[in-house]
Structures are given as structure tokens and as C-alpha cells.
A protein has these predicted regions:
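Terminal (often C-terminal) interaction modules
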Residues: 161-213
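Catalytic cores of NTP-dependent nucleotidyl/adenyl transfer enzymes across multiple folds
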Residues: 2-157, 210-211
Length: 213
């Protein structure tokens, strides 16, 4: 029940305060409790939730169709999610692109963590990468820099094409990426700017290397 999740959220907040006295525990998030600093090397999000058995799970018994319901304390309500199906689709695309999918995810997520100025969740960044065409993420040996070009080109397409931007979905298809309360054009612009800066840095470094030949 919802009241049990609300109680679990309060217990988790108190437990984190007690277990990590030197860290900063941010309890303001509607869906997660964030903790960073102290003995932690990076920010961690704790998301109170409960199991949720979808109709597809009941039909197949396959764990990839089992879902969770995440507490949104601001309403309060529970939001259904299917993380195992999400991961299965990510794995599938990564195989189809020879590892390019996960490289694109790591690249854009690293820019988010390094800059701290990209107002997009890691989930939505991964979802953007998931929608990049497979051919753009498939590269020859030694051609890893093509992943940067693929990410930048696709983000520019999303900037210019509002119909495309508003149509793309998260991997498990339960919502659009760009919708109320989730990814925004501002966040996309910030990500694109960081990708452009990285591409310019790579170009300058390559030019210096050629001049030394």
C-alpha cells in the first residue's frame, strides 16, 4: 500500500542519516533520496519502491517483465516502471551495435557527471542514446570517436526537429522521453553544448598532432 511506501521512505531517510553522518543526505527529491560526500566517492540515489507484477509477467513468468512501483511523495502516488525490460532492450541494442550503445551511454553520462550543468536524468540520457540509429553507433575497430559524432549529430537533430523530439520513447515504451516532469529542451541544449565542446577539444588535439608530424 501507498502508506507503507511512505513509511519506508521515512525509515530510509533516517537510516541514511545515521549510517552516513559525514555525508549530505538530500531528502527533497520526490522520487529518490540522494546522498553524497563523506566516505562516498560519488552521488548515490536511493529509490523507495515495491514489486509490481505486469500482465506480461503473469503470462510468461519471465523476470524481464516484472515491474516496480516507485513512490512519488509529492503527490503522493506510485509510478509503475519496468527496469528489467529496460535493461533487456539496452542489452539487445548493445549487441546489435557491437558495443556502441553502451559507449554512447557512458560518454554522455560522463559529460553529465563532469559538468554538473546538464539538467537531464541518467535514465533519459540512456533513453536518448537508445534512439540513435544502430548504424550510427556501429563503428569499425579504432573508430571509437565516431560514437561522439553520432551522439552530437543525433542531439542536434532533436534540437531542430520538435516532432522527432516529442515522438521518441524510453526503451520499455512506458512514456515519452521529452514530457512533463522529465527531459526538457533546456537539458538537451546543455548536453549538446557539452558534446560540441568535447568535439572541438578533440579536433584541436588532432590538429596539434598533425602539426607535429
Amino acid at each position: 500500500p501507498l502508506k507503507d511506501l511512505l513509511s519506508l521512505r521515512k525509515e530510509a531517510e533516517d537510516a541514511l542519516d545515521s549510517a552516513f553522518p559525514q555525508a549530505e543526505v538530500d531528502k527533497t527529491g520526490s522520487k529518490s533520496i540522494s546522498i553524497e560526500g563523506g566516505s562516498l566517492t560519488r552521488k548515490v540515489d536511493v529509490v523507495p519502491s515495491n514489486w509490481y507484477n505486469t500482465n506480461k509477467y503473469a503470462e510468461t513468468g519471465s523476470d524481464i517483465y516484472r515491474g516496480v512501483q516507485i513512490l512519488d511523495k509529492s503527490v503522493p502516488t506510485r509510478l509503475a516502471n519496468t527496469p528489467f525490460l529496460h535493461n533487456a532492450w539496452i542489452d539487445h541494442k548493445d549487441v546489435n551495435t557491437g558495443g556502441g550503445m553502451r559507449k554512447a551511454c557512458r560518454l554522455m553520462k560522463s559529460l553529465k557527471y563532469d559538468s554538473e550543468n546538464i539538467d537531464l536524468s541518467s535514465y533519459d540520457i540512456v533513453s536518448i542514446a537508445f534512439n540513435i540509429p544502430d548504424a550510427s553507433l556501429t563503428y569499425p575497430q579504432g573508430g571509437e570517436l565516431l560514437i561522439l559524432s553520432a551522439c552530437l549529430d543525433y542531439c542536434r537533430q532533436l534540437q531542430m526537429n520538435s516532432a522527432l523530439r516529442e515522438s521518441i520513447e524510453v526503451p520499455d515504451k512506458h512514456r515519452k522521453i521529452f514530457c512533463d516532469g522529465h527531459a526538457t529542451l533546456l537539458g538537451l541544449n546543455q548536453l549538446t553544448q557539452e558534446l560540441e565542446q568535447l568535439a572541438n577539444d578533440v579536433l584541436r588535439e588532432n590538429q596539434r598532432s598533425f602539426r607535429r608530424l
